UniProtKB/Swiss-Prot annotation:
UniProt protein name: Adenylosuccinate synthetase
General function of this protein: Plays an important role in the de novo pathway of purine nucleotide biosynthesis. Catalyzes the first committed step in the biosynthesis of AMP from IMP.
Source organism of the structure: Shewanella woodyi (strain ATCC 51908 / MS32)
Residues that, per the record, bind IMP: 14-17, 39-42, 130, 144, 225, 240, 304
Binding residue positions for GTP: 13-19, 41-43, 306, 332-334, 415-417
Active-site residues, record numbering mapped to chain: 14, 42
Enzyme Commission no: 6.3.4.4
Pathway membership, UniProt: Purine metabolism; AMP biosynthesis via de novo pathway; AMP from IMP: step 1/2
Length: 431
Protein backbone atom coordinates (compact mmCIF):
# COMPACT_ATOMS: atom_id res chain seq x y z
CA UNK A 1 0.00 0.00 0.00
CA UNK A 2 1.16 3.53 -0.74
CA UNK A 3 1.83 5.96 2.06
CA UNK A 4 0.15 9.31 2.56
CA UNK A 5 2.61 11.98 3.65
CA UNK A 6 2.16 15.56 4.86
CA UNK A 7 4.93 18.11 4.30
CA UNK A 8 4.49 21.31 6.28
CA UNK A 9 6.46 24.21 7.71
CA UNK A 10 7.15 24.31 11.44
CA UNK A 11 8.24 27.95 11.72
CA UNK A 12 6.92 31.21 10.21
CA UNK A 13 7.12 29.90 6.66
CA UNK A 14 10.05 30.09 4.21
CA UNK A 15 11.53 26.84 5.54
CA UNK A 16 12.19 25.28 2.14
CA UNK A 17 9.02 23.22 1.69
CA UNK A 18 8.86 23.57 -2.09
CA UNK A 19 12.19 21.89 -2.69
CA UNK A 20 11.37 18.97 -0.40
CA UNK A 21 7.91 18.49 -1.90
CA UNK A 22 9.45 18.48 -5.37
CA UNK A 23 12.03 15.92 -4.23
CA UNK A 24 9.46 13.59 -2.66
CA UNK A 25 6.98 13.81 -5.53
CA UNK A 26 9.15 11.31 -7.38
CA UNK A 27 7.47 8.71 -5.17
CA UNK A 28 3.93 10.10 -5.12
CA UNK A 29 1.03 10.00 -7.56
CA UNK A 30 -0.80 13.03 -6.20
CA UNK A 31 0.34 16.31 -4.64
CA UNK A 32 -2.37 18.27 -2.82
CA UNK A 33 -2.46 21.89 -1.65
CA UNK A 34 -4.98 22.11 1.19
CA UNK A 35 -4.80 25.68 2.57
CA UNK A 36 -3.60 29.19 1.88
CA UNK A 37 -3.55 30.85 -1.50
CA UNK A 38 -1.09 32.67 -3.72
CA UNK A 39 0.46 34.22 -0.63
CA UNK A 40 2.68 31.12 -0.57
CA UNK A 41 6.03 31.19 -2.33
CA UNK A 42 7.56 27.79 -3.02
CA UNK A 43 10.93 27.90 -4.77
CA UNK A 44 12.24 24.93 -6.76
CA UNK A 45 15.72 24.68 -8.28
CA UNK A 46 16.20 21.83 -10.73
CA UNK A 47 19.48 21.54 -12.63
CA UNK A 48 20.13 25.19 -11.85
CA UNK A 49 16.77 26.41 -13.19
CA UNK A 50 14.67 28.29 -10.65
CA UNK A 51 10.87 28.08 -10.54
CA UNK A 52 8.71 29.95 -8.02
CA UNK A 53 5.18 28.68 -7.47
CA UNK A 54 2.54 30.49 -5.45
CA UNK A 55 -0.67 28.54 -6.01
CA UNK A 56 -0.04 25.42 -8.09
CA UNK A 57 1.38 22.45 -6.13
CA UNK A 58 5.13 21.88 -6.34
CA UNK A 59 4.70 18.51 -8.06
CA UNK A 60 3.66 20.19 -11.31
CA UNK A 61 7.13 19.72 -12.82
CA UNK A 62 6.85 15.92 -12.57
CA UNK A 63 5.19 14.19 -15.51
CA UNK A 64 3.91 11.28 -13.40
CA UNK A 65 2.10 13.39 -10.81
CA UNK A 66 -1.41 14.81 -10.61
CA UNK A 67 -1.52 18.14 -8.74
CA UNK A 68 -4.64 19.06 -6.81
CA UNK A 69 -5.84 22.38 -5.39
CA UNK A 70 -8.15 21.38 -2.54
CA UNK A 71 -11.20 23.13 -1.13
CA UNK A 72 -9.21 24.73 1.69
CA UNK A 73 -7.27 26.88 -0.78
CA UNK A 74 -8.55 30.36 -1.65
CA UNK A 75 -8.11 30.68 -5.40
CA UNK A 76 -7.39 33.89 -7.29
CA UNK A 77 -8.27 33.24 -10.97
CA UNK A 78 -5.87 35.90 -12.27
CA UNK A 79 -2.97 34.52 -10.21
CA UNK A 80 -3.76 30.98 -11.36
CA UNK A 81 -3.81 32.00 -15.02
CA UNK A 82 -0.51 33.87 -14.67
CA UNK A 83 1.13 30.82 -13.13
CA UNK A 84 -0.30 28.48 -15.75
CA UNK A 85 0.98 30.76 -18.51
CA UNK A 86 4.48 30.80 -16.99
CA UNK A 87 4.58 27.02 -16.76
CA UNK A 88 3.21 26.45 -20.25
CA UNK A 89 5.88 28.76 -21.66
CA UNK A 90 8.38 26.35 -20.12
CA UNK A 91 6.72 23.41 -21.81
CA UNK A 92 4.79 22.08 -18.80
CA UNK A 93 1.44 20.54 -19.88
CA UNK A 94 -0.48 22.04 -16.97
CA UNK A 95 -3.96 20.97 -18.11
CA UNK A 96 -2.87 17.32 -18.06
CA UNK A 97 -1.56 17.53 -14.50
CA UNK A 98 -3.70 20.04 -12.58
CA UNK A 99 -7.06 19.38 -10.89
CA UNK A 100 -9.15 21.81 -8.83
CA UNK A 101 -11.93 21.50 -6.27
CA UNK A 102 -15.17 23.27 -7.18
CA UNK A 103 -15.45 24.23 -3.51
CA UNK A 104 -12.40 26.52 -3.53
CA UNK A 105 -13.38 30.03 -2.42
CA UNK A 106 -12.56 32.68 -5.02
CA UNK A 107 -10.31 35.66 -4.39
CA UNK A 108 -11.66 38.55 -6.43
CA UNK A 109 -10.35 42.13 -6.92
CA UNK A 110 -12.41 43.58 -4.07
CA UNK A 111 -10.73 41.19 -1.64
CA UNK A 112 -7.32 42.57 -2.60
CA UNK A 113 -8.58 46.15 -2.38
CA UNK A 114 -9.90 45.48 1.13
CA UNK A 115 -6.68 43.78 2.21
CA UNK A 116 -4.58 46.75 1.11
CA UNK A 117 -6.98 49.33 2.56
CA UNK A 118 -7.00 47.62 5.95
CA UNK A 119 -3.23 47.35 6.18
CA UNK A 120 -2.90 51.02 5.29
CA UNK A 121 -5.49 51.98 7.91
CA UNK A 122 -3.66 50.01 10.61
CA UNK A 123 -0.56 52.18 10.16
CA UNK A 124 2.16 51.14 12.61
CA UNK A 125 -0.03 48.24 13.78
CA UNK A 126 -0.11 46.59 10.35
CA UNK A 127 0.00 42.80 10.44
CA UNK A 128 2.22 42.53 7.37
CA UNK A 129 -0.14 40.71 5.00
CA UNK A 130 0.86 40.14 1.39
CA UNK A 131 -2.05 42.31 0.24
CA UNK A 132 -3.33 39.51 -1.96
CA UNK A 133 -6.83 39.25 -0.54
CA UNK A 134 -6.31 36.03 1.40
CA UNK A 135 -7.87 37.16 4.68
CA UNK A 136 -10.93 38.88 3.18
CA UNK A 137 -11.62 35.81 1.01
CA UNK A 138 -11.53 33.51 4.05
CA UNK A 139 -13.79 35.96 5.89
CA UNK A 140 -16.37 35.70 3.11
CA UNK A 141 -16.15 31.92 3.29
CA UNK A 142 -16.81 31.85 7.04
CA UNK A 143 -19.56 34.47 6.67
CA UNK A 144 -21.19 32.22 4.03
CA UNK A 145 -21.33 34.98 1.47
CA UNK A 146 -18.22 33.91 -0.46
CA UNK A 147 -18.23 32.85 -4.09
CA UNK A 148 -16.66 29.52 -5.01
CA UNK A 149 -15.16 28.10 -8.18
CA UNK A 150 -18.31 26.08 -8.84
CA UNK A 151 -20.41 29.25 -8.82
CA UNK A 152 -18.71 30.33 -12.05
CA UNK A 153 -20.44 27.56 -13.97
CA UNK A 154 -23.88 29.23 -13.72
CA UNK A 155 -23.29 32.70 -15.15
CA UNK A 156 -26.68 34.12 -14.18
CA UNK A 157 -26.53 32.94 -10.59
CA UNK A 158 -22.89 34.02 -10.29
CA UNK A 159 -23.78 37.53 -11.47
CA UNK A 160 -26.51 37.79 -8.82
CA UNK A 161 -24.28 36.57 -6.01
CA UNK A 162 -21.42 38.80 -7.12
CA UNK A 163 -23.61 41.90 -7.19
CA UNK A 164 -24.76 41.27 -3.63
CA UNK A 165 -21.32 40.65 -2.15
CA UNK A 166 -19.75 43.54 -4.05
CA UNK A 167 -22.38 45.96 -2.80
CA UNK A 168 -21.37 45.02 0.73
CA UNK A 169 -17.62 45.30 0.17
CA UNK A 170 -17.75 48.42 -1.98
CA UNK A 171 -19.72 50.11 0.79
CA UNK A 172 -16.88 49.28 3.20
CA UNK A 173 -14.25 50.48 0.73
CA UNK A 174 -15.90 53.81 -0.06
CA UNK A 175 -17.60 54.74 3.20
CA UNK A 176 -15.24 53.36 5.82
CA UNK A 177 -11.82 53.27 4.15
CA UNK A 178 -12.51 56.20 1.77
CA UNK A 179 -11.13 54.23 -1.19
CA UNK A 180 -12.40 53.76 -4.72
CA UNK A 181 -15.06 51.15 -5.38
CA UNK A 182 -14.18 48.07 -7.44
CA UNK A 183 -16.00 47.90 -10.78
CA UNK A 184 -18.72 45.24 -10.84
CA UNK A 185 -19.00 44.78 -14.62
CA UNK A 186 -15.26 44.38 -15.07
CA UNK A 187 -15.03 41.90 -12.20
CA UNK A 188 -17.92 39.87 -13.61
CA UNK A 189 -16.51 39.84 -17.13
CA UNK A 190 -13.01 38.78 -16.05
CA UNK A 191 -14.30 36.01 -13.80
CA UNK A 192 -16.69 34.48 -16.34
CA UNK A 193 -14.06 34.65 -19.09
CA UNK A 194 -12.19 31.69 -17.60
CA UNK A 195 -15.17 29.72 -16.29
CA UNK A 196 -15.08 27.05 -19.01
CA UNK A 197 -11.32 26.67 -18.70
CA UNK A 198 -11.54 26.09 -14.95
CA UNK A 199 -14.49 23.73 -15.34
CA UNK A 200 -12.36 21.41 -17.46
CA UNK A 201 -10.03 20.90 -14.49
CA UNK A 202 -12.61 20.58 -11.71
CA UNK A 203 -13.13 17.28 -9.89
CA UNK A 204 -14.62 15.90 -6.69
CA UNK A 205 -11.35 15.98 -4.75
CA UNK A 206 -12.59 13.97 -1.77
CA UNK A 207 -13.78 11.12 -3.99
CA UNK A 208 -10.62 11.18 -6.11
CA UNK A 209 -8.30 11.02 -3.10
CA UNK A 210 -10.31 8.26 -1.45
CA UNK A 211 -10.18 6.16 -4.60
CA UNK A 212 -6.43 6.80 -4.85
CA UNK A 213 -5.99 5.67 -1.25
CA UNK A 214 -7.96 2.49 -1.85
CA UNK A 215 -5.83 1.78 -4.92
CA UNK A 216 -2.66 2.15 -2.84
CA UNK A 217 -1.45 5.22 -4.72
CA UNK A 218 0.81 7.43 -2.56
CA UNK A 219 -0.42 10.96 -1.84
CA UNK A 220 1.64 13.94 -0.70
CA UNK A 221 -0.04 16.91 1.01
CA UNK A 222 1.83 20.19 0.57
CA UNK A 223 1.46 22.77 3.32
CA UNK A 224 1.94 26.50 2.81
CA UNK A 225 3.22 29.14 5.25
CA UNK A 226 4.18 27.60 8.62
CA UNK A 227 2.88 26.31 11.95
CA UNK A 228 3.57 29.56 13.81
CA UNK A 229 1.33 31.39 11.33
CA UNK A 230 -1.68 29.13 11.95
CA UNK A 231 -4.87 31.12 12.53
CA UNK A 232 -5.59 29.20 15.76
CA UNK A 233 -2.16 28.09 17.01
CA UNK A 234 0.15 30.82 15.72
CA UNK A 235 1.29 34.16 17.17
CA UNK A 236 -2.21 35.65 16.91
CA UNK A 237 -3.06 38.20 15.52
CA UNK A 238 0.18 38.15 13.51
CA UNK A 239 -0.89 35.05 11.63
CA UNK A 240 -2.32 33.98 8.30
CA UNK A 241 -6.03 33.23 7.80
CA UNK A 242 -5.91 29.45 7.42
CA UNK A 243 -4.95 26.35 9.39
CA UNK A 244 -1.36 25.74 8.35
CA UNK A 245 -1.01 22.77 10.68
CA UNK A 246 -1.62 19.08 9.97
CA UNK A 247 -5.27 19.35 10.98
CA UNK A 248 -5.83 21.50 7.91
CA UNK A 249 -5.19 18.52 5.64
CA UNK A 250 -8.51 16.85 6.42
CA UNK A 251 -10.63 20.00 6.35
CA UNK A 252 -8.88 21.44 3.30
CA UNK A 253 -9.03 18.35 1.10
CA UNK A 254 -11.70 16.04 2.47
CA UNK A 255 -9.14 13.30 3.11
CA UNK A 256 -9.78 11.29 6.28
CA UNK A 257 -7.25 12.09 9.04
CA UNK A 258 -6.77 8.44 10.07
CA UNK A 259 -5.33 7.72 6.64
CA UNK A 260 -2.28 9.97 7.10
CA UNK A 261 0.87 7.92 7.67
CA UNK A 262 3.70 10.41 8.16
CA UNK A 263 4.03 14.13 8.94
CA UNK A 264 7.31 15.68 7.82
CA UNK A 265 8.08 19.00 9.51
CA UNK A 266 10.35 21.32 7.55
CA UNK A 267 12.64 23.23 9.93
CA UNK A 268 15.29 25.72 8.93
CA UNK A 269 18.60 25.45 10.85
CA UNK A 270 17.90 28.96 12.09
CA UNK A 271 14.68 31.01 12.11
CA UNK A 272 13.24 33.76 9.91
CA UNK A 273 10.06 35.77 9.89
CA UNK A 274 8.54 38.11 7.29
CA UNK A 275 6.44 41.05 8.41
CA UNK A 276 5.37 42.08 11.89
CA UNK A 277 4.93 39.93 14.97
CA UNK A 278 6.87 38.57 17.96
CA UNK A 279 10.24 36.92 17.36
CA UNK A 280 12.15 36.13 20.60
CA UNK A 281 15.41 34.99 18.95
CA UNK A 282 15.63 37.76 16.35
CA UNK A 283 19.19 38.89 15.62
CA UNK A 284 19.49 42.56 14.74
CA UNK A 285 23.26 42.41 14.51
CA UNK A 286 26.15 41.26 12.33
CA UNK A 287 25.26 37.58 12.76
CA UNK A 288 21.70 38.30 11.68
CA UNK A 289 23.02 40.09 8.61
CA UNK A 290 25.21 37.06 7.87
CA UNK A 291 22.25 34.68 8.06
CA UNK A 292 20.05 36.94 5.94
CA UNK A 293 22.67 37.51 3.25
CA UNK A 294 24.05 33.98 3.03
CA UNK A 295 20.57 32.47 3.24
CA UNK A 296 19.17 34.83 0.56
CA UNK A 297 16.37 35.67 2.95
CA UNK A 298 13.95 37.61 0.82
CA UNK A 299 10.31 36.57 0.46
CA UNK A 300 9.49 34.61 -2.71
CA UNK A 301 6.03 36.20 -2.80
CA UNK A 302 6.62 39.80 -1.70
CA UNK A 303 10.38 40.24 -2.03
CA UNK A 304 10.42 41.59 1.52
CA UNK A 305 13.55 41.11 3.60
CA UNK A 306 13.11 38.36 6.19
CA UNK A 307 14.02 38.87 9.83
CA UNK A 308 16.67 36.29 10.91
CA UNK A 309 17.34 34.73 14.31
CA UNK A 310 18.53 31.62 16.13
CA UNK A 311 16.56 28.38 16.04
CA UNK A 312 13.79 28.39 18.64
CA UNK A 313 13.29 24.94 20.15
CA UNK A 314 10.48 26.18 22.41
CA UNK A 315 8.44 27.03 19.32
CA UNK A 316 9.51 23.82 17.59
CA UNK A 317 8.24 21.74 20.51
CA UNK A 318 4.86 23.36 20.04
CA UNK A 319 5.02 22.46 16.34
CA UNK A 320 5.74 18.84 17.24
CA UNK A 321 2.72 18.77 19.56
CA UNK A 322 0.24 20.36 17.18
CA UNK A 323 1.27 18.43 14.07
CA UNK A 324 2.22 15.05 15.62
CA UNK A 325 5.42 15.33 13.60
CA UNK A 326 6.96 12.01 12.60
CA UNK A 327 10.32 13.46 11.60
CA UNK A 328 12.01 16.69 10.61
CA UNK A 329 13.75 17.86 7.48
CA UNK A 330 16.51 20.29 8.50
CA UNK A 331 17.14 22.85 5.75
CA UNK A 332 19.79 25.50 5.09
CA UNK A 333 22.35 23.86 7.39
CA UNK A 334 25.04 25.32 5.12
CA UNK A 335 24.03 28.89 6.05
CA UNK A 336 25.53 28.29 9.51
CA UNK A 337 28.94 27.48 7.99
CA UNK A 338 31.67 29.81 9.21
CA UNK A 339 30.07 30.84 12.50
CA UNK A 340 32.30 30.43 15.57
CA UNK A 341 29.32 29.37 17.63
CA UNK A 342 25.67 28.58 17.05
CA UNK A 343 22.88 29.08 19.56
CA UNK A 344 19.59 27.36 20.30
CA UNK A 345 16.72 28.89 22.25
CA UNK A 346 15.67 26.42 24.96
CA UNK A 347 13.43 28.67 27.07
CA UNK A 348 11.77 32.06 27.47
CA UNK A 349 12.74 34.13 30.52
CA UNK A 350 10.30 36.64 32.01
CA UNK A 351 11.23 39.80 33.95
CA UNK A 352 10.56 38.05 37.29
CA UNK A 353 13.23 35.47 36.45
CA UNK A 354 10.86 32.61 35.70
CA UNK A 355 11.59 30.52 32.62
CA UNK A 356 8.92 29.01 30.37
CA UNK A 357 9.53 26.08 28.04
CA UNK A 358 6.20 26.39 26.22
CA UNK A 359 5.09 29.18 23.92
CA UNK A 360 2.49 31.80 24.90
CA UNK A 361 -0.89 31.46 23.21
CA UNK A 362 -1.03 35.00 21.79
CA UNK A 363 1.39 37.66 20.61
CA UNK A 364 1.02 39.72 23.79
CA UNK A 365 2.57 36.90 25.80
CA UNK A 366 5.88 37.36 24.01
CA UNK A 367 6.27 41.05 24.79
CA UNK A 368 8.57 40.74 27.81
CA UNK A 369 10.34 37.45 27.14
CA UNK A 370 14.05 37.10 26.43
CA UNK A 371 15.45 33.88 24.95
CA UNK A 372 17.41 31.44 27.09
CA UNK A 373 20.16 30.38 24.71
CA UNK A 374 22.28 27.25 24.68
CA UNK A 375 25.61 27.78 22.91
CA UNK A 376 27.37 25.16 20.80
CA UNK A 377 30.65 25.29 18.84
CA UNK A 378 30.25 26.28 15.21
CA UNK A 379 32.21 24.92 12.26
CA UNK A 380 34.45 26.43 9.62
CA UNK A 381 34.07 23.63 7.08
CA UNK A 382 31.86 24.01 4.01
CA UNK A 383 28.69 21.89 4.09
CA UNK A 384 27.08 23.39 0.99
CA UNK A 385 25.99 20.66 -1.40
CA UNK A 386 26.91 17.80 0.95
CA UNK A 387 25.04 14.63 0.05
CA UNK A 388 26.08 12.25 2.83
CA UNK A 389 26.39 12.48 6.61
CA UNK A 390 30.04 11.49 6.33
CA UNK A 391 30.74 14.80 4.60
CA UNK A 392 29.49 16.85 7.55
CA UNK A 393 31.91 18.20 10.19
CA UNK A 394 31.58 16.83 13.71
CA UNK A 395 30.33 20.15 15.08
CA UNK A 396 27.46 20.15 12.57
CA UNK A 397 26.61 16.56 13.49
CA UNK A 398 26.63 17.54 17.17
CA UNK A 399 24.22 20.38 16.40
CA UNK A 400 21.85 18.00 14.60
CA UNK A 401 22.05 15.45 17.41
CA UNK A 402 21.31 18.11 20.02
CA UNK A 403 18.21 19.24 18.14
CA UNK A 404 16.97 15.65 18.01
CA UNK A 405 17.49 15.34 21.77
CA UNK A 406 15.72 18.59 22.59
CA UNK A 407 12.78 17.89 20.28
CA UNK A 408 12.57 14.14 20.96
CA UNK A 409 11.99 13.78 17.22
CA UNK A 410 14.37 12.46 14.55
CA UNK A 411 15.83 14.56 11.76
CA UNK A 412 15.16 12.29 8.80
CA UNK A 413 16.23 14.58 5.95
CA UNK A 414 19.00 17.20 5.74
CA UNK A 415 19.16 19.85 3.02
CA UNK A 416 22.43 21.63 2.22
CA UNK A 417 21.51 23.64 -0.86
CA UNK A 418 18.63 24.75 -3.09
CA UNK A 419 18.92 22.04 -5.76
CA UNK A 420 16.90 18.85 -5.30
CA UNK A 421 20.17 16.84 -5.43
CA UNK A 422 21.72 18.68 -2.48
CA UNK A 423 19.85 16.57 0.05
CA UNK A 424 20.44 13.65 2.41
CA UNK A 425 17.44 11.38 2.92
CA UNK A 426 18.27 9.40 6.06
CA UNK A 427 14.75 8.01 6.45
CA UNK A 428 12.36 8.13 3.50
CA UNK A 429 8.84 9.19 4.55
CA UNK A 430 7.36 6.97 1.84
CA UNK A 431 9.33 3.84 2.79
Amino acid sequence: MGKNVVVLGTQWGDEGKGKIVDLLTEQSKYVVRYQGGHNAGHTLVIDGEKTVLHLIPSGILRDNVKCIIGNGVVLAPDALMTEIKMLKERGVPVEERLLISEACPLILPFHCALDIAREKARGNNAIGTTGRGIGPAYEDKVSRRGLRVGDLFDAELFAEKLKEVMAYHNFMLTEYYKCEAVDYEETLKDALAIADYLKSMCVDVTELLDQARKAGEPILFEGAQGTLLDIDHGTYPFVTSSNTTAGGVATGSGFGPRHLDYVLGIMKAYTTRVGAGPFPTELQCEIGDHLGTKGHEFGATTGRKRRPGWLDVVAMKRAVQINSISGFCLTKLDVLDGLEEVKICVGYQYPDGSVATVTPLAAEGYEQVTPVLETMPGWSENTFGATSVEQLPQAALNYIKRLEELLDTPIDIISTGPDRNETMILVNPFS
